[in-house]
């Protein structure tokens, strides 16, 4: 019988190949505390590395976790010079991309072209998660240009940021439509922006989408390479978080994304004398047993409920000891 993996994240902390680490889970399970404390730990243990934490969760709790106000540009964390944090709004990243197309008027009677373009854009925007997918492409490009050695993502609740892996296939479909439109309407494409009252140059749409496709294909290649990327689910020992975590892990595996570590957070101590806590701990024990069986091949890190708020660099440093090997 094979031994279970160590109950720590040393393989991530000491990795010389990892470039991207995702931390995700149901809201309220402690994923932001996990991502921030892990970022502090990796930066402190690897002073030669430039580490960046990117929050893509609309709640942006990273500012609260560090007790520092962060924004859309990377900001260094005082006391941890090789760690920076930024908070990205995916809605801002998508803003204006297709503005005006669906609302375009048809004053010159170009019903055929208007219908084709509006239908194409409408279909493109209706793809679930397409805004996050394109925003991720922009975010990844930005992070790559900054030359960080490791990027940790504090993601939106369970699964929301995984849809970007479908972006290449969506873009390929859209490119086929753009090519078809150019073949059908030819020179009219360059005049269409004036017809519907928008500044979009549809002759530039094809090369832009080709560039986006090339970028997204490389991102997917990197994100499905276990030497470069891993995903860490965070949960608490209750039914819904466990159910959603199992669904998330199955989705990750179907997308060929590596997941080998799980954080089980907010565990109540066994010897708590409060009746409510005893009953709560009894429920937790049931799900902890299921977690042990389901994820015996994973690095399982179990963390007790914290008696104090985890806020600020010193508190994050203290919390991060849960991820290290015990000596």
Curated annotation (Swiss-Prot):
Question: What keywords is this UniProt entry annotated with?
Answer: ATP-binding, Cytoplasm, Endoplasmic reticulum, Hydrolase, Metal-binding, Nucleotide-binding, Transport, Zinc
Where Zn(2+) is bound, by residue?
274, 277
- What Pfam families has UniProt attached to this entry? ArsA_ATPase
Q: Cross-referenced SUPFAM superfamilies, in alphabetical order?
A: P-loop containing nucleoside triphosphate hydrolases (SSF52540)
Q: Where does ATP bind?
A: 26-33, 238, 265
Per the record, its GO cellular-component terms are: GET complex
Q: What broad class describes the main subcellular location of this protein?
A: cytoplasm
Q: Gene3D superfamilies from the xrefs?
A: P-loop containing nucleotide triphosphate hydrolases
Q: What positions constitute the catalytic site?
A: 57
The molecular function terms in GO held by this entry are: ATP binding; ATP hydrolysis activity; metal ion binding
Name the GO terms of the biological process aspect. Answer: tail-anchored membrane protein insertion into ER membrane
Provide the family line.
Answer: Belongs to the arsA ATPase family.
- PANTHER family registered for this protein in UniProt: ARSENICAL PUMP-DRIVING ATPASE ARSENITE-TRANSLOCATING ATPASE, ATPASE GET3
Q: What is this protein called?
A: ATPase ASNA1 homolog
Lineage of origin? Eukaryota, Amoebozoa, Evosea, Archamoebae, Mastigamoebida
